[in-house]
Amino acid sequence: ELRHAAAGKDIVDLADGNHILSGVHNGVKFGECMFLDCFVISRKLLLDMFEWYAPTDYLDIFEAMAGDFGRINVQTFEFTGYVAPIFTKRDYYKSNMAMLDMDVQDDLFPEERTVKTKAHDTPPAKNEVGSRVTNSRVSSGCRIYGNVSDSILGRDVVVEPGATVRSAIIMQGCVIKTGARVENAIVDRNNVVSAGTELRGTPEDVLVKEKPSE
């Protein structure tokens, strides 16, 4: 049997060679293929399912097809590139920190598969005199006066003199004030970390500072 895991928990069994779905069961073992929650489905079948289950708020695709197992033609494509499933804040933190690894970057963004994104007319990041930045990804528009290491900074982040950012994800528009320290944390966009404040988590229990209420 060829097995694929759905969302890290469900296994889809395909009878070898005939592309017929034989069932879904829970549990995944090391060495089995994980379903990436991506699939191509017949437009007609998808529209039929929308009509059949219109009154339902949410329904898993495999639950919707459960009554048709045995007749649906299912085929697979093996993806061998970099994958980072994100289901928890720790997953999010770890997958972002992995972007500091050049091997992961090269695997995720190969030259032959470019990523096109929206352009922003912001100036390059500027490391001011007296600042120190090591092993970090710093986006355009940032101004660094303090110390940044092993971190990821979104656009237009300001790290003031005497502030320290270590092993952290700082999102767009944040200001880390003088003397503040942020470590093993995720700071959502447009936050201001007050002078002298310490935000510190651990790699296993990451601290999250949510977006300020408007």
Listing of model-derived features with the role each one plays in the protein:
Residues 1-53:
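Conserved core of the sugar-phosphate nucleotidyltransferase
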